[in-house]
Amino acid sequence: MKKKICSIINFIRLEDHRMPEIDHLEPVMEQMKLIGKYRFPATWLMQTDAMLEGPYPELFQRELPEGNELGIWLEITRLHCEAAGVEFRGRDGVNWDHHSQASLTIGYRRSERIALVEASMKIFHEKFGYYPRSVAAWYLDAFTLGYLEEKYHITATANCRDQWGTDGYSIWGGFWAGAYYPSRGNANLPGEDESGQIRVPLFRMLGSCPVNQYDSSLGENGQGVCTLEPTACKDPRWMKILFRNMFGNLATDYSYVQLGQENSFGWPRMKDGYVMQMEELAKACAAGEAEVMTMGDSGEWFLSNYRVTPPLATVALEDPEPAGRQAFWYNSRYYRASLTRRGKHLALRDLHCFDNRYRETYLESRCHTHAMIADALPVVEGFLWQKNGVPAEMKIEVQDSGSWKEPEFDTLSVDTATDNRLEIMASGKNGTVFWCFTESSVMIRLDAGAPWRILLPVNPEVFRRAEPEKLVFEHNGCVYETGLSGISGTDETETAVLLEAASGKAVHFYP
C-alpha cells in the first residue's frame, strides 16, 4: 500500500518585532482547538526563546492533544544566544532578526552551532523531561544535522520548500518534495550512499504547487508563494487540486505534504485558511486519500523502510490556474528533474545533479550576508537561466519538410504501475515520444520516422563542453558530468547544445 502522508507542523515564535500588535498565543490556542476537534496527531516546534519566556511549556503540559508531538524550531534569537553564551549576529535592539546571518545556524561558527544546539536541547529537557525527536528550521546545515543525529538521535528534520530569494532564502535545486537522507557535506542534497548520508529523514515543507511554484515570477521579495500556507491558501478548490496532484497518481512508494503555520502571522490572517484546511484534511482522511502523521512518526516510518533515499515522483495533471499546464517531478539520490506540458508541447524545465563532492557553502565557514544560497549542480535550469521571459528548457526537435520543428502532442498518458519509475508517453502528428525516469537515468525516445535531436540551452558560465558520451559542467568550482548514450553527434551554438539522436536509438542521460 502506497503511503499518502500529511504532517501538520505548527512552529512557535516568542515575538516578531515587525508586527508588535500580533497576539502570538491566540493562534496556538485556536490551532490546538481545531487539531483536538479532528483528533489529528500534530507537531509543535518551539523556538528556544518561546520555551524560555513564553507560556507554551505550561500550556502544552496542560492541554497538548493526545498523540501530538513537541519539538524544536531551531531559529536563532538573541535570548537563545544569551543562553548559549554566543554572540547574536542580528541587529541591535531586536530579539529575532529573520536575516540569514542571524536566524539560521549557518550564521554561526561550528563551535557556536554546537553551543546553540546544546542550549536548546537542555532547555527543552528541563521543561519536558525528555529530548525531542523532531528538530527543524528553514535551513539547517549538514554539520548541525550531523551533530543532532550523532548525539541526540533525532528521527526527523525539515527545511523550507524549494524557492529562490523569498525572505532572503534561496534553497534551490535539491530534492523537490518528500524526504531524503541529507549528504554529510551538503544538507540541500541527498547522500548518494549510506556512508555519505546523515541518517535523519529531511522533509520538505509548505506544500508547494508542483505546477506553478517552480517558475513563479521573481519580485522584490524573491519568488511568489504558491503553497498550502494558510495565510495564502484559503481556497478549498486549490487545496483539493494540490492533494490530487500530490496523492492521486503515485508512481513511487509514497508522497508527503506539510500543513500548518507559524504563530507570528496572527490568527486573524490565517484563520480562514487554517479552518478550511483542517476541514478538507479531515474529509481526505475519511475518504482514504491521506493520513496524518506527526513529523517524528513520519521520520520513524521512513527510517524503518529505507536504508538510502528512495525515488519520489509527482504526477501533477491539474493546474489550479487557467493556463492548464501539467508537471511531472522525479527525485532520486542522484538527480532531480521536472517535465512540463504546455498545450501540445513538452519540455524538460529542470535537471539538477546530486554529487556529494559538492559541499554546501556554509559547511565550515559562516554566512555573513542577509541572503543565503543553498543549491545543487544544474544541467537544465529553466527558471534561473531564462532570457526575456523565455524559459531555458530542454526540448525535442524533429526534422519536418527540411527544417527542425518542435513536435506537437495531442494525447498524454502516465504509467504509474511501475517499480519506482516514472513513464510518460505522448502522441501527435509528429509521432510518439516516451520519457522514462529511473533512479539513475532519464530516457527519451521519439518514434517519428524522421531524424530528431535534443536542444539543450546552456549557461556559458557553467557549461564547459559536449562530447558524444558526456556533457561537462562546472559550478562554484565543482566540475561534474552527465553521461550520454544514443547520441550520434553534437553541435554547439552560443546559447545551446544540439544532441543528434542516433537512428532507432533512445537517448539516455546519466546525471
Indicate where each model-derived feature is located.
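Beta-strand-rich recognition/accessory modules
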Residues: 230-235, 239, 259-261, 472-511
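Catalytic domains of cell-wall/extracellular-matrix polysaccharide-remodeling enzymes
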Residues: 109-183, 440-445
